[in-house]
């Protein structure tokens, strides 16, 4: 197990949480993002994730560095799963510990937002009647809407 990694097997929640444990930390916040069945009114059968693994792991570590700069004293572990995932499977886990809970919560939320912005991970949504590759986790359509280009 690495502190920041891309995996193909189910995510081991306790291992990544335990990585952040430290006698000086008073709070550990663990976020797990799961495959949901419904997105924008469309029923999802499953998802498939792909990543450029060396760059994705580098970007996950970069996010960890950003968190350590903004919230000194935090310890971060981030793992994202790739390959086919069923409904309710864990796709991403972020564990952040800090001396106090406020920083752990804020850093954890920052991490998931940054993952969606900078980590080269793509997902394919498979529905009952079709499929679509999403350019990155926020999706090209959402980016175009935000820029007024839809």
Swiss-Prot record:
Binding site for substrate: 34-36, 44, 100-101, 116, 123-125
Pfam family, one: MoaE
Regions annotated as coiled coil: none
Pathway the protein contributes to: Cofactor biosynthesis; molybdopterin biosynthesis
Class of the enzyme per the UniProt entry, highest EC level: transferase
EC number, as in UniProt: 2.8.1.12
Protein name: Molybdopterin synthase catalytic subunit
CDD domains with a match to the protein in the record: MoaE (cd00756)
Substrates-to-products reaction catalysed: 2 [molybdopterin-synthase sulfur-carrier protein]-C-terminal-Gly-aminoethanethioate + cyclic pyranopterin phosphate + H2O = molybdopterin + 2 [molybdopterin-synthase sulfur-carrier protein]-C-terminal Gly-Gly + 2 H(+)
Organism: Staphylococcus carnosus (strain TM300)
Record keywords, A-Z: Molybdenum cofactor biosynthesis, Transferase
Annotated signal peptide: none
MF annotations from Gene Ontology: molybdopterin synthase activity
Role, per record: Converts molybdopterin precursor Z into molybdopterin. This requires the incorporation of two sulfur atoms into precursor Z to generate a dithiolene group. The sulfur is provided by MoaD.
Family membership: Belongs to the MoaE family.
The keyword DNA damage is annotated on this UniProt entry: no
Keyword set includes Transferase: yes
Subunit description: Heterotetramer of 2 MoaD subunits and 2 MoaE subunits. Also stable as homodimer. The enzyme changes between these two forms during catalysis.
One of the GO biological process terms: Mo-molybdopterin cofactor biosynthetic process
């Amino acid at each position: 197990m690495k502190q920041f990694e891309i995996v193909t097997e189910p995510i081991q929640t306790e291992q990544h949480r335990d990585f952040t444990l430290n006698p000086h930390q008073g709070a550990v916040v663990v976020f797990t993002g799961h495959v949901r069945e419904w997105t924008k009114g469309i029923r999802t059968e499953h998802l498939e994730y792909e990543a450029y693994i060396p760059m994705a792991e580098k970007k996950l570590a970069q996010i960890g560095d950003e968190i350590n700069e903004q919230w000194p004293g935090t310890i971060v572990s981030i793992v994202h799963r790739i390959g086919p995932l069923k409904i309710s499977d864990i796709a991403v886990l972020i564990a952040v510990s800090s001396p106090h809970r406020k920083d752990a919560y804020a850093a954890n939320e920052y991490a998931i937002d940054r993952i969606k912005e900078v980590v080269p991970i793509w997902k394919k949504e498979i529905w009952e009647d079709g499929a679509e590759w999403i350019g990155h986790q926020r999706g090209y359509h959402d980016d175009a809407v935000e820029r007024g280009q839809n």
